[in-house]
Amino acid sequence: HHIKVLEEELNVCIFDRSNGKVVVTREGEEVINCAKKMLGLYNSLRQDLSDSRRLVSHLTVGVTHTAESNPIAEALANYGAQNDHVMIKMITGTINKLYSKLKSYEIDLAIVEGRIPDPEIRYLLMDTDYLVLAVSVHHPFAKRAMVTLEELKKERMILRLPSSGTRNLFAAHLESNNQSINDFNVILELDNIATIKDLIRRDFGVSILPRSVCLGELKKKSIAVLPVENLSMVREINLAYQSDFAQTDILHDLVESYQETLRRYQ
C-alpha cells in the first residue's frame, strides 16, 4: 500500500510487476538510492544529537580488505584510545561498496586505495603504497634484489580475487607490458590477505601484495618482499569523505595517528 501511494505521489513506477516477476525499474533504483541517503542522514542526525548530549563523537570508518590488513586498524585503535570522546566503528567492504555507503551517509569516512573522479568526494592523502612480490624467507627469491616477469611465470601464484584493487592494479601493469594474468601459474585465488600471507610463509606459493600489509611480517622476518622488474606498481592510500563532512580536525588527527603507527614498524 505504501509503495503504491509513493508511486502515485512521485508519478513513477518503482517496480515492474509484469511477467509474474517484481523487478526494480530505473526510476525505482533512483528512489531507493535517495531513500538510503535520507535514511543515512536521519541516522546521522540522531547520532549527532545523541552525541551532543553525551559530549562524544561516533565515527563509522569503512576500509577495504587491504587497508584492514595494514596498520590502519591499529592506528584507529590508537586514536580511539587517546581520545575518550571519540567512538570508532570500523567496517570492511569492497571499494565500490564503500563508495556507495559513503555517498548514502552510511559511513562517515572511507580509507581506500586510489581515487575516483567524483565532485562530492574529497580526499586526504594518508600514505603512498606499492605492490611487491611476497615470498617465503626460505624461497630462492628471498635473497634477490629483483625478479623478472619471466622468472615469475615459473612460480605458483596465489592472488587476490579479480574484484580487488590489488589484483586490478597488477593486471593493468601486466597489460602495459603486453602480458596477461593468464600467462602465469595461478593456483589459488582468495580474498583473505591473512590467509594468503600464511600460505606464502609455508611456501605454498608467492603473491603480489601491497607492501603495507606485510610490515608486521617484515619486522618479524617471516616474509620477504622484492620488486618485479618493469612493474612500478605505486598507489595512494587516501582518506575519503563527503564534501559536507564537518569534523575536518579529526581527518588530520587520523593521518597523524597512522603516520605514528607506521614509525613503529621502521
Region annotations inferred by a language model:
Residues V5-V24:
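A short LG(V/I)-centered, amphipathic sequence patch enriched
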Residues E120-L131, V135-I158, P162:
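Flexible hinge/capping segments at coil-to-helix
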Residues P71, F204, A224-Q266:
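A late-sequence structural motif
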Residues M157-N178, Q247-T248, V255, Y265-Q266:
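Secondary-structure junction motif
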Residues T94-Y99, K103-I107, V112-E113, E175-I223:
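Hydrophobic hinge/microswitch elements
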